[in-house]
UniProtKB/Swiss-Prot annotation:
Its cofactor is Mg(2+). GTP binds at residues 166-173, 191-195, 213-216, 284-287, 315-317. The gene is obg. Keywords: Cytoplasm, GTP-binding, Hydrolase, Magnesium, Metal-binding, Nucleotide-binding. Its EC number is 3.6.5.-. Residues 160-334 form the OBG-type G domain. PROSITE patterns: G_OBG (PS51710), GTP1_OBG (PS00905), OBG (PS51883). GO terms for biological process: ribosome biogenesis. Monomer. It is found in: Cytoplasm. One of its GO terms (molecular function) is GTPase activity. This is GTPase Obg.
Amino acid sequence: MKFIDEARIEAIAGNGGNGSASFRREKFVPFGGPDGGDGGRGGSVFAQADRNINTLIDFRYAKKHVARNGENGRGSDCYGAAGEDVTLRMPVGTLISDMDTGEVIADLTEHGQLVCLAEGGMGGWGNLHFKSSTNRAPRQQVDGKPGERRMLKLELKVLADVGLLGMPNAGKSTFISHVSNARPKVADYPFTTLHPNLGVVRVDHEQSFVVADIPGLIEGAAEGAGLGHQFLRHLQRTGLLLHIVDIAPFDENVDPVAEAKAIVNELKKYDETLYDKPRWLVLNKLDVVPEEERAARVKDFVKRYKWKGPVFHISALTGEGCRELVYAIKDHLAALKAEEAAALAEPDIRLDDRLHNVDRDDSKA
């Protein structure tokens, strides 16, 4: 299936049905009172997150989604039927925003999450509501309200804990296929990966994390060159970026340090927030380097790159160094979750001070 991670749709809710202005007319009851029923509410358009869907391709071609109108009220106190709702199933990780106002309507982050995109109009009142002691035969009724109509932008940002960053052919797909259950296409030419791949890395029976592999970046990606710029948004939800570098390129004219710097520059141009995320350097393809030269090669790269953060050297092909990297990632993610939990549990000191001041003022009074 083709991977589509952006779409534009129109959601049109149903109009409410009109209220009825009718009177009871039966044999031997020539002047019965009002019996006009209310109109039914219009159908609404909902979005629901579904973990079994991983692309927005259905919305690339079906752009207009219309809910039914509510039925009009009728005599004999008959209320109009409500219009049928429309529920659109979308991938988990879809961000929905209003194209006219720019407002973010919803961020579907959990399976089953249900959000109203366009609300149906309320049904109008029948003349039964207007009966009073002074107006026994009201002829007024209320028309139904129109339903909402919205132009919406859908953006899919995959939910992953770790994102892989690097030049084409750096070995990202080989790495994710070695450590996870993902089976991306792997070949010895650039741009083998054409869309994001997700892999679940199981550390043990109870612990796992999700890795996202996006197409490789090239210089000028932030301005639209290559493929990777289209998919950088999929790294925005991650808690850690792995910058994978081919430390032993076949072309001797290629400088791995220059390529690594180019990737980081593209990242900064695209999104400062993404640039500021925790990032680890992973030097890949050490199996190609003679064992006696590896330490010197790594040391030289780190020195010329002026890198101060964590460094890992692996061979994604043979698996050398991958286990240590996986366990380091697990510990890092666990620490992040612990920090988030502590931040949520931390009391609001300012609120406590305000409450204390209120109590003190009350005691003075």
